[in-house]
């Protein structure tokens, strides 16, 4: 153990109940404030779209679920939540779609009714389909003008050769334009079967009553047949893959990415520590050496992206056009220094303290608690996963950080993508 001040978060008091139709309910009572966060998680994201890969179907469906149910139109959905002082929103990623409402506890019952209605009884009205499709087309166009989004898409399509995360969550315009309302509704019926959903509630509620209420709303929905989606395993990365994208920019924006294991792998904590030592903040090695000392970049950072599938260890930077080669070499040189010279105890302990503080902050509000439980469940089916992660983070030894740098950050096996000024 590196740090004698070993801290441990107590196990969650959240409960899990499974209804007869397979829908799972997770409830965490917290009466510290009269607030509730309720979330519906669907195990369907852009990587699960099968024959429609690249069309952005999951994201489009997220938009359309707010457009009307059997009992409410779009305005009535929004007004019902606002009347309780609540806020409703949603997001879609590679492997999930999440709908959430934050509300004062006095409005919990009505907001729960709205959330269940939206997720389980959506109509996807034809008269809303065309207008919402136009909204998403504008989103796609905005993304094509956003350098960070363009660079991220370039990284994923280059780093992955067969895994469906190489397609953007929002989809490609030409494939998106082929979607019809019936295609979307068929996908909805398939993916939003109760056994592919779970509901998380955290806050000022009674757990038994909450489970009963959710069962009254959703327990009568029958499971629907869902074809299994087998995700291809990304083959071993061989060599250096490169892509350079001309873009309307004065700077060169670069990213270097190395394949790393999924988020539940035992090496995850050591990789997170390595990323923070290299590129998290002004005290990081890359900032001090490559930006301040050598003045080769305008900005630089690092992060470890470890989802439910093979992830990426990413180093990013912005630099002047004439400095990109030198910046690349200097950044790779800092990795070599970790491999040859190791890391310091105070560097590791600083990262651990920051992670503990971040986790504590996450658990101080209801949405943070609900999101933590939901993410843990969809990733590992262990509600205490992040608590276990914090324990593991504090057990990382100096040699573990060097080992993962040696094992995963090979100098002849990574992806390099960049945005360069248009000629």
Language-model segment annotations:
Residues 12-13, 18, 26-29, 74-228, ...:
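Charge-rich, well-structured scaffold segments of protease-associated domains
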Residues 39-41, 226-283:
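His/Glu-based metal-binding/catalytic segments typifying zinc-dependent metallopeptidases
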Residues 285-293:
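Short amphipathic alpha-helix segments
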């Amino acid at each position: 153990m590196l740090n004698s001040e070993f801290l441990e978060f107590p196990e969650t008091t959240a409960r899990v109940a499974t209804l007869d139709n397979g829908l799972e309910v997770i409830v965490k009572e917290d009466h510290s404030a009269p607030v509730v966060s309720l979330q519906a998680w669907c195990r369907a994201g852009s990587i699960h779209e099968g024959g429609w890969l690249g069309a952005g179907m999951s994201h489009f469906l997220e938009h359309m679920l707010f457009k009307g149910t059997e009992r409410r139109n779009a305005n009535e959905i929004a007004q019902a939540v606002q009347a309780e002082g609540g806020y409703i929103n949603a997001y879609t990623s590679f492997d999930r779609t999440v709908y959430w409402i934050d509300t004062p506890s006095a409005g919990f019952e009505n907001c729960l009714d709205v959330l269940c209605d939206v997720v389980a009884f959506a109509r996807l009205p034809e008269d809303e389909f065309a207008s919402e499709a136009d909204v998403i087309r504008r989103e796609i166009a905005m993304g094509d003008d956003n350098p960070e989004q363009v660079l991220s898409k370039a990284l994923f399509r280059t780093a992955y050769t067969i895994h469906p995360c190489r397609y953007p969550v929002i989809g490609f315009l030409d494939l998106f334009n082929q979607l019809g309302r019936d295609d979307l509704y068929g996908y909805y019926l398939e993916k939003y079967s109760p056994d592919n959903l779970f509901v998380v509630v955290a806050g000022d509620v009674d757990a038994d009553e909450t489970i009963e209420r959710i069962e009254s709303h959703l327990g009568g929905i029958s499971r629907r047949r869902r074809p299994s989606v087998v995700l291809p395993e990304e083959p071993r990365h061989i060599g250096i893959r490169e892509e350079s994208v001309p873009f309307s920019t004065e700077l060169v924006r670069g990213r270097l990415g190395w394949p790393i294991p999924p988020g539940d792998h035992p090496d995850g904590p050591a990789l997170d520590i390595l990323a923070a030592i290299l590129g998290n903040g002004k005290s990081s090695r890359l900032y001090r050496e490559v930006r301040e000392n050598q003045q080769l970049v305008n900005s630089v950072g690092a992060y470890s992206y470890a989802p439910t599938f093979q992830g990426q260890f990413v180093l990013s930077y912005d630099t002047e056009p004439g400095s990109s080669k030198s910046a690349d070499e200097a950044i790779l040189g800092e990795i070599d220094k970790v491999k040859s010279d190791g890391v310091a105890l105070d560097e590791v302990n600083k990262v651990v303290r920051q992670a503990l503080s971040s986790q504590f902050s996450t658990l101080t509000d209801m949405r943070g608690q609900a999101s933590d439980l939901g993410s843990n469940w969809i990733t590992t089916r262990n509600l205490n996963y992040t608590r276990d992660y914090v324990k593991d983070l504090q057990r990382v030894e100096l040699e573990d950080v060097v080992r993962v740098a040696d094992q995963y950050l090979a100098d002849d096996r990574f992806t390099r993508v960049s945005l360069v000024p248009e000629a």
